[in-house]
């Protein structure tokens, strides 16, 4: 090959790489490359798979892992990460020793938190168990095991020992969104992902993948026996294409449109309620509209003691809301990481499960976005400056290092909050 041709091909290849949306290159359009997950002949590079490293031993369904989740983590966890990294959703154990937080800061959270158990001694020994901090996926190759306490999904019957990434995400990405907004598993070909603010829209000849390749109506993993098919469709939502990042300076806004709580209810059916009034379950879902009063509180609340906020800059990713729309033009305009779209709630906005919880795991019990196990988010030093604390063996840090607490708040240092900041339930309720 002539030198000039080599240079031209190199430039062309580089241009293609730069133009390709890296966030969904492997799962482009939903489905991944078959050989990325499966091995046809128990071989890899001419060698028997089971003689390779343990996590790449062939598993059921010709997977390149012992379980579905292990196969996912072959790509979605990477030993040696030093910070939030692209599409990684789990931190290797060696990269999060005692006193060090899991590294990934995707909107869904880092599964590594479920391996973090904390103890502290205040009026006796207190414990925050790791398994209480998230969905306990089964991925033995990576030392993730089923929840030992909650043997079925809270509010439902989905078996904990069968909880895999594929319990929520359709690994073959069959669910697709058409130009009229409808969702189906067949029809037009899927031309690209539909998850991101820079995703191409569906057209008359091509659909786009459902949000985060989630399973929709009728979905049930083939490996799961019994009757667990989803009753509700995938939600309308859009994420920024760069989403795994610290929020120390600017926030990562996922634009939640509608249907998230309804989708969560596929497994957690009996703990959902979308209609007022109730004194048993916090309303969540398309019917749980803020109304003018709650929207006004959300928009005015900045921190404990400060209700001077305005709607134009009220959004907080530690307490996101659903916008009550499936208009993807609107949602794409709000999925940002540069704080140029911080518009707050209105009367038609609503609470959804992810207003309080993260989808994968978090640094706190019940996988909440903020700590509910102590009345204060911060305390104060002698000068009145906000701090998370200095001693892990206190109620403020609850066994965590300052580094871990900061990471649990996605890089936010304590001075982002008021001294003696109360729980962020007050973003909507303003009781402080």
Curated annotation (Swiss-Prot):
Subcellular location: Cell outer membrane; Cell surface
Cofactor comment: Binds 6 low-spin heme groups per subunit.
Record-linked InterPro entries: Cytochrome_c-type_ET (IPR051174), Multihaem_cyt_sf (IPR036280)
GO BP of this protein: anaerobic respiration
Induction: Expressed in the presence of insoluble Fe(3+) oxide and during growth with fumarate as the sole electron acceptor, but not during growth on soluble Fe(3+) citrate. Induced in the cocultures with G.metallireducens.
Gene disruption phenotype: Deletion of the gene inhibits Fe(3+) oxide reduction, but does not impact reduction of fumarate or Fe(3+) citrate. Deletion negatively impacts the expression of omcT.
Keyword Membrane: yes
Primary residence: membrane
Key words of the record: Cell outer membrane, Electron transport, Heme, Iron, Membrane, Metal-binding, Signal, Transport
SUPFAM superfamilies for this protein: Multiheme cytochromes (SSF48695)
Region forming the signal peptide: 1-25
GO annotation, cellular component aspect: cell outer membrane; cell surface
Keyword Metal-binding: yes
GO molecular function, one term: metal ion binding
Cofactor(s), names only, from the UniProt record: heme
The protein's role, per its UniProt record: Plays an important role in extracellular electron transfer. Can transfer electrons to insoluble Fe(3+) oxides as well as other extracellular electron acceptors, including Mn(4+) oxide and humic substances. Essential for direct interspecies electron transfer (DIET) in cocultures with G.metallireducens.
Protein known as: C-type cytochrome OmcS
Organism listed in the record: Geobacter sulfurreducens (strain ATCC 51573 / DSM 12127 / PCA)
Organismal lineage: Bacteria, Pseudomonadati, Thermodesulfobacteriota, Desulfuromonadia, Geobacterales
Gene, per the UniProt record: omcS
């Amino acid at each position: 090959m002539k030198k000039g041709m080599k240079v031209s091909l190199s430039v062309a290849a580089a241009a293609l790489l730069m133009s390709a949306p890296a966030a969904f290159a492997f799962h482009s359009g939903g489905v991944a490359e078959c050989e990325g997950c499966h091995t046809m002949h128990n071989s890899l590079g001419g060698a028997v798979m089971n003689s390779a490293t343990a996590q790449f031993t062939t598993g059921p369904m010709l997977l390149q892992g012992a379980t579905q989740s292990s196969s996912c983590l072959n790509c979605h966890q990477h030993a040696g990460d030093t910070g939030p990294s692209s599409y990684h959703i789990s931190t290797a154990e060696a990269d999060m020793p005692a006193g060090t937080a899991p590294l990934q800061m995707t909107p869904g959270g880092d599964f590594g938190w479920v391996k973090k158990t904390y103890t502290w001694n205040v009026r006796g020994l207190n414990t925050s168990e790791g398994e209480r901090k998230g969905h306990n996926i089964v991925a033995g190759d990576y030392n993730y095991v089923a929840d030992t306490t909650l043997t079925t999904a809270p509010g439902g019957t989905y078996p904990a020992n069968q909880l895999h990434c594929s319990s929520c995400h359709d690994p073959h990405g069959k669910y697709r969104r058409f130009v009229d907004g409808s969702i189906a598993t067949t029809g037009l070909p899927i031309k690209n992902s539909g998850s991101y603010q820079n995703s191409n829209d569906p057209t008359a000849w091509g659909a786009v993948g459902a949000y985060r390749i989630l399973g929709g109506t009728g979905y049930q993993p083939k490996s799961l026996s019994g009757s667990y098919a989803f009753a509700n469709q995938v939600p309308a939502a859009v994420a920024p294409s760069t989403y795994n990042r610290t929020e120390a300076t600017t926030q990562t806004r996922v634009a939640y449109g509608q249907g998230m709580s309804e989708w969560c209810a596929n497994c957690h059916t009996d703990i959902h309620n979308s209609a007022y009034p109730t004194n048993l379950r916090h309303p969540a879902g398309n019917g749980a509209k803020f109304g003018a009063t709650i929207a006004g509180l959300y928009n005015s609340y900045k921190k404990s003691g400060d209700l001077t906020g305005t709607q134009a800059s009220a959004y907080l990713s530690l307490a996101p809301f659903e916008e009550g729309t499936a208009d993807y033009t609107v949602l794409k305009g709000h999925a940002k990481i540069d704080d140029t779209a911080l518009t707050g709630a209105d009367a038609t906005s609503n609470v959804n499960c992810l207003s309080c919880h993260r989808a994968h795991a978090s640094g706190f019990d019940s996988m909440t976005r903020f700590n509910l196990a102590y009345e204060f988010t911060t305390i104060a030093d002698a000068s009145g400056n906000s701090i998370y604390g200095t001693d892990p063996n206190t109620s403020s840090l609850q066994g965590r290092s300052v580094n871990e607490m900061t990471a649990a708040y996605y890089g936010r240092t304590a001075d982002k909050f008021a001294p003696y900041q109360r729980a962020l339930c007050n973003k909507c309720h303003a009781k402080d």
